[in-house]
Amino acid sequence: MIIVTGGAGFIGSNIVKALNDKGITDILVVDNLKDGTKFVNLVDLNIADYMDKEDFLIQIMSGEELGDIEAIFHEGACSSTTEWDGKYMMDNNYQYSKELLHYCLEREIPFLYASSAATYGGRTSDFIESREYEKPLNVYGYSKFLFDEYVRQILPEANSQIVGFRYFNVYGPREGHKGSMASVAFHLNTQLNNGESPKLFEGSENFKRDFVYVGDVAAVNLWFLESGKSGIFNLGTGRAESFQAVADATLAYHKKSSIEYIPFPDKLKGRYQAFTQADLTNLRNAGYDKPFKTVAEGVTEYMAWLNRDA
């Protein structure tokens, strides 16, 4: 059995889909379905069982055996960069992850988990997986950073696989439940389908991020499980592309050309990553050599998926 925490969420459900595509269906999804809309991410997937994340944690902490576990993909977390309840964030993202990590270490179960490019904070170059480059801007980024630091202490002594992925700007199918945290491509598509003019912040040609397609993210996760490699790795494309490029690809799909530019909100000033670009040196040195989709390629595929029933 393979366990995917956050399996009804964005990246987790895409990992479940990638496993299904390989013929794997003996999957336990762990999540919190208080937001019941997330069920839509699972309706077309095949899983063996579902468990609430709190019930799962109780079983983990009691040391109860869950059966023959091949691996745990730990994608479950509060991923809101605008959430400032630090106690909630640390309980949910840090303590929970530690409990799960130790459960895996004691049983030599491969543990593959979601870290984040938010660990780098507001820097504009050298996104390298090393302490001197890390300075998160928000408590979400801090919770991810601190768990990475915890893993770094344990890695040299670990007898089983531990691998963390610093996800950059992931976009693609199954993110609709994320609301304001969904990608720009998702929001632009929604605006266009509602007959509204698509909106971008002023200066969006200057805001550049490493936008990585979720199908590529899932593929990297599965490759690492098969390879058995451990470590903490950036997971982006290695290319920074502008929000304008995302808009251009979305507009091209919809055969539209006009866009409305809106003022940049004060509440985001100083807390907003204006530039991200993954350094893929470590990922490539680990042996992952497949190409990543460009924004034009990924957004076009995503638009086809979003509008498949239109």
Curated annotation (Swiss-Prot):
Superkingdom: Bacteria
Swiss-Prot/TrEMBL catalytic activity: ADP-D-glycero-beta-D-manno-heptose = ADP-L-glycero-beta-D-manno-heptose
Cofactor: NADP(+)
Residues that span the membrane, as ranges: none
UniProt cross-references to HAMAP family, sorted A to Z: Heptose_epimerase
Similarity annotation: Belongs to the NAD(P)-dependent epimerase/dehydratase family. HldD subfamily.
Record's function text: Catalyzes the interconversion between ADP-D-glycero-beta-D-manno-heptose and ADP-L-glycero-beta-D-manno-heptose via an epimerization at carbon 6 of the heptose.
Protein name in UniProt: ADP-L-glycero-D-manno-heptose-6-epimerase
Source species of the chain: Salmonella dublin (strain CT_02021853)
Biological classification of the source: Bacteria, Pseudomonadati, Pseudomonadota, Gammaproteobacteria, Enterobacterales
